[in-house]
Amino acid sequence: MIALIQRVKRADVRVGDRTTGEIGAGLLALVCAERGDNEAAADKLLAKLLGYRVFSDAAGKMNLPVSNIDGAGGAGGLLLVSQFTLAADTNSGLRPSFTPAAPPDEGARLFDYFVAAARERHPVVETGEFGADMQVSLVNDGPVTFWLQVRP
């Protein structure tokens, strides 16, 4: 599974004229299931995402996870947005191949599992809508962006 995470001041996702999720300071994670991924891969990616230290401590070093963005136990928001294009094969030609991405039904199942697991482990979780045409807005803080990928 893949997550492209961005440290944000704020972020939101809309489907048409409806806001499906929005957060203040925290992480926006674009999430993609690849062929062969399973719940174990989702759990491993979620643990990495929740523990990844990308927020600054009092000394200005990236040393704090999203569960403690202020150094005093305050949790930041987590906005999870499905994005199958992260699995694109861009090695040949001028058109990406999405063969490496999980099929839509499996991708939806794993994304739903990932969201449910995140909600069990983190207090502020918002989402986009799987398979929808979404508009994502964010104010990137830094900018700080990381590619996280785990294999089953």
From Swiss-Prot:
GO terms for biological process: D-amino acid catabolic process. Its main location: cytoplasm. It is found in: Cytoplasm. This is D-aminoacyl-tRNA deacylase. The keyword Hydrolase applies. NCBIfam families: D-aminoacyl-tRNA deacylase. It comes from the Bacteria. GO terms for molecular function: D-tyrosyl-tRNA(Tyr) deacylase activity; Gly-tRNA(Ala) deacylase activity; Ser(Gly)-tRNA(Ala) hydrolase activity; tRNA binding. Keywords: Cytoplasm, Hydrolase, RNA-binding, tRNA-binding. Homodimer. It catalyses: glycyl-tRNA(Ala) + H2O = tRNA(Ala) + glycine + H(+); a D-aminoacyl-tRNA + H2O = a tRNA + a D-alpha-amino acid + H(+).
